[in-house]
Amino acid sequence: MSIVFQIALAALVFFSFVMVIGVPFAYAAPQYWDQSKPLLWVGSGIWTILVIVVAVLNFFVI
């Protein structure tokens, strides 16, 4: 279970870095807003799911 937690945590950290770069770029480029908006919603949903998964796994690991 510990290795699953570590993989989920690494995925959350990596995806957070991607979102830190991607979200400001999406807001700064108004000509691509129509293309970026669905990606922001999907990215936010994935990030939220990863946070919940890490929280649940943390409960089982500790």
UniProtKB/Swiss-Prot annotation:
Chain segments annotated as transmembrane: 8-28, 41-61
InterPro entries: PSII_PsbZ (IPR002644), PSII_PsbZ_sf (IPR036512)
GO biological process assignments: photosynthesis; photosystem II stabilization
Keywords noted in UniProt: Membrane, Photosynthesis, Photosystem II, Reaction center, Thylakoid, Transmembrane, Transmembrane helix
GO cellular component: photosystem II reaction center; plasma membrane-derived thylakoid membrane
Pfam families assigned to the protein according to its UniProt record, in alphabetical order: Ycf9
Subcellular location: Cellular thylakoid membrane
Membrane topology label: Multi-pass membrane protein
Family of this protein: Belongs to the PsbZ family.
Physiological role: May control the interaction of photosystem II (PSII) cores with the light-harvesting antenna, regulates electron flow through the 2 photosystem reaction centers. PSII is a light-driven water plastoquinone oxidoreductase, using light energy to abstract electrons from H(2)O, generating a proton gradient subsequently used for ATP formation.
HAMAP family tied to this protein: PSII_PsbZ
The protein's assembly and partners: PSII is composed of 1 copy each of membrane proteins PsbA, PsbB, PsbC, PsbD, PsbE, PsbF, PsbH, PsbI, PsbJ, PsbK, PsbL, PsbM, PsbT, PsbX, PsbY, PsbZ, Psb30/Ycf12, peripheral proteins PsbO, CyanoQ (PsbQ), PsbU, PsbV and a large number of cofactors. It forms dimeric complexes.
Alphabetical list of NCBIfam families matching this protein: PS_II_psbZ (TIGR03043)
Protein's recorded name: Photosystem II reaction center protein Z
Organism: Gloeothece citriformis (strain PCC 7424)
